[in-house]
């Protein structure tokens, strides 16, 4: 899991810390996840990956929130509740190709823009998330 990035100079911080840590990071991640699934739910460009999800996105929203909180360096909410994420195994039932990966990234980048993420932070976060999304490909 990634949770550290290079800041200007040699200072290192987690994405969670850069999002505001305990004071604001959790809320920012929650808002990001809500925006992400809102994009997926309403944007026709994301229709194919939306179809991979249940009609009710409540569980998906909560699980992604818990996962991203820990993945960014915050509390390990997902692991505490469900154990190791085993992302690839959990996604094997779905046909995930380059198009699905790109749709997922499209939703995430739109959500980051909607939430007003700093450009530099957004770029670094998107680069790391792309690696995770690409790892999910099984076709």
Question: Regions from the language model: what does each represent?
Answer:
Residues 1-139:
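Core of compact, soluble alpha-helical bundle domains
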């Amino acid at each position: 899991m990634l949770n550290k990035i290079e800041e200007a100079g040699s200072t290192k911080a987690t994405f969670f810390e850069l999002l505001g840590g305990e004071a604001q990071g959790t809320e920012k991640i929650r808002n990001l996840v809500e925006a992400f699934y809102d994009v997926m739910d309403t944007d026709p460009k994301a229709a194919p990956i939306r179809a991979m999800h249940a009609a009710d996105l409540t569980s998906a929203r909560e699980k992604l929130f818990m996962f991203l909180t820990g993945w960014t360096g915050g509390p390990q909410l997902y692991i505490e509740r469900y154990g190791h994420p085993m992302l690839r195994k959990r996604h094997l039932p779905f046909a995930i190709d380059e198009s699905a990966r790109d749709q997922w990234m499209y939703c995430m980048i739109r959500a980051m823009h909607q939430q007003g993420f700093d450009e530099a932070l957004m770029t670094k976060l998107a680069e790391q998330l792309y690696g995770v999304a690409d790892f999910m490909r099984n076709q």
